[in-house]
């Protein structure tokens, strides 16, 4: 039995061993990945707490899982048996907001939507906008390089990060990046840690880039189609225009049906799929009308433009609605925009071949698709759901896509790595991991 005496001395009541409390922090939102029985939980309140915890774990060769808000979907934050959990939820301070330079320093445990609201008091906003923004944390967004609804206009999380504070596996603390727009000093360590899913170090704070809130009132639009592939073709056409929306999402008929049964919004279930999006700026109304007119010319049978957020709220509720149905297996694939219609055709063929319904929601404007299959509590049905999602993932790869657009790899997608990365790339990843975490304590067996 490993002695926790040194950690108790360093952390006091911030070290928790109560079994019920530890269990509550032992997994993320994925139901398809198992968790272990950790020996203790660190409720870190400072970088020094994280440093002490990692220094101890490294000396003891104890595996560490790192947790923000637990909204991840790939088992990346799940506990290890005999391991240590480090929770960053108490590191929830916004250190400063600098409107002149459009920068802010924030600790990793700050909830994304709350941080965005604080920035808006200064006429600015934080660009990353995951569907779970009201629950997820800035640190979690950085660790997975999260995307979200506004990606097509503002990029992924890495495009909004200037500096990081990172605690390495041995407890040493380092800073990466610079406040300036240009910085070519040394390797780009900031981007190395972004999206590393806790395998290279624990991100404790960041300086992030903000943008000014667009003038005028945003406009929301909807276009419904009889066929899923027609909606994909419309997305390709929309994104080829000189002016594109800030948000462009897709929900197929099954996903709208699921959301409406979970939390009715009054949104009509389309025959095939619907596009929902948002335009911003003083010409938002003009932009939205142009988009729905384009959609109508490409087969949309029903369109609308409004100032209501109901449509986007329905999209944000898709994952909670799916979770309410029970165990599910999902993917997070990405495909080139021009291949969306082909991707949807393939997904429908796979679903028909297996005789199962597949729900698809997408950050359509950047080609990021989330396909989900219900997996009832039987080993046989779970295997079928896994096989369907694997087929969809391989189909996306055949179109020049990726196995993960924003959720990360964690443990759920670990078996897919070799489908996308060649052996040399995997060796390079391993070399980087060994250099920064020679004892392999940081989320071992996940991400890479």
Stretches with model-predicted labels:
Residues 1-30, 60-62, 294-310, 398-403, ...:
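N-terminal accessory segments
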Residues 1-55, 72-102, 253-264, 306-330, ...:
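N-terminal flexible segment immediately upstream of the FAD-binding catalytic core
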Residues 17-27, 212, 224-391, 395, ...:
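C-terminal substrate-recognition/cap domain of FAD-linked oxidoreductases
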Residues 45, 68-69, 128-137, 363:
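Active-site nucleophile and cofactor-binding loops and adjacent substrate-binding regions
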Residues 93-249, 441-442:
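FAD-binding subdomain of flavoenzyme oxidoreductases
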Residues 172, 414-448:
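Activity-critical C-terminal alpha-helical subdomain
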């Amino acid at each position: 039995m490993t002695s926790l005496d040194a950690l108790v001395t360093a952390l006091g009541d911030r070290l928790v061993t109560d079994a019920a409390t530890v269990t509550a922090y032992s997994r993320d939102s994925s139901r398809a990945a198992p968790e272990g029985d950790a020996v203790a939980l660190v409720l870190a309140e400072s970088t020094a707490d994280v440093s002490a915890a990692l220094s101890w774990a490294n000396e003891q060769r104890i595996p560490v899982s790192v947790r923000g808000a637990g909204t991840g979907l790939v088992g990346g934050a799940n506990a290890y048996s005999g391991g240590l959990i480090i929770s960053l939820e108490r590191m929830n301070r916004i250190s400063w907001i600098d409107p002149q330079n459009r920068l802010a320093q924030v600790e990793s445990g700050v909830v994304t939507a709350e941080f965005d609201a604080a920035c808006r008091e200064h006429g600015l906003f934080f660009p990353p906008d995951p569907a779970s923004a009201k629950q997820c944390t800035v640190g979690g967004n950085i660790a997975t390089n999260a995307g979200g609804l506004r990606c097509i206009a503002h990029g992924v999380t890495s495009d909004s990060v200037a500096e990081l504070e990172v605690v390495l596996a041995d407890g040493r603390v380092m800073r990466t990046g610079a406040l300036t727009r240009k910085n070519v000093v040394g390797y780009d360590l900031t981007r190395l840690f972004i999206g590393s899913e806790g395998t290279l170090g624990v991100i404790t704070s960041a300086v992030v880039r903000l943008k000014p809130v667009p003038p005028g009132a945003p406009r929301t639009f909807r276009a419904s189609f009889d066929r899923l592939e027609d909606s994909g073709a419309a997305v390709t056409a929309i994104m080829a225009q000189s002016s594109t929306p800030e948000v462009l999402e897709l929900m197929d008929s099954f996903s709208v049906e699921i959301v409406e049964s979970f939390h009715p919004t009054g949104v009509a279930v389309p025959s095939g799929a619907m596009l929902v999006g948002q335009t911003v700026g003083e010409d938002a109304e003009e932009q939205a009308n142009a988009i729905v007119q384009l959609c109508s010319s490409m087969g949309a049978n029903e369109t609308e433009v409004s100032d209501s957020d109901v449509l986007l709220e329905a999209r944000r509720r898709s994952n909670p609605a799916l979770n309410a149905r029970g165990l599910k297996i999902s993917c997070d694939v990405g495909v080139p925009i021009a291949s969306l219609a082909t991707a949807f055709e393939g997904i429908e063929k796979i679903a028909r071949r297996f005789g199962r319904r597949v729900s698809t929601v997408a950050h359509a404007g950047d080609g990021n698709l989330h396909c989900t299959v219900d997996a009832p509590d039987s080993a046989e049905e779970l295997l079928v759901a896994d096989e369907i999602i694997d087929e969809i993932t391989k189909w996306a790869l055949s179109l020049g896509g990726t196995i993960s657009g924003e959720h990360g790899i964690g443990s759920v997608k670990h078996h897919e790595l070799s489908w996308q990365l060649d052996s040399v790339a995997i060796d390079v990843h391993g070399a980087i991991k060994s250099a920064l975490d020679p004892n392999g304590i940081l989320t071992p067996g996940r991400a890479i």
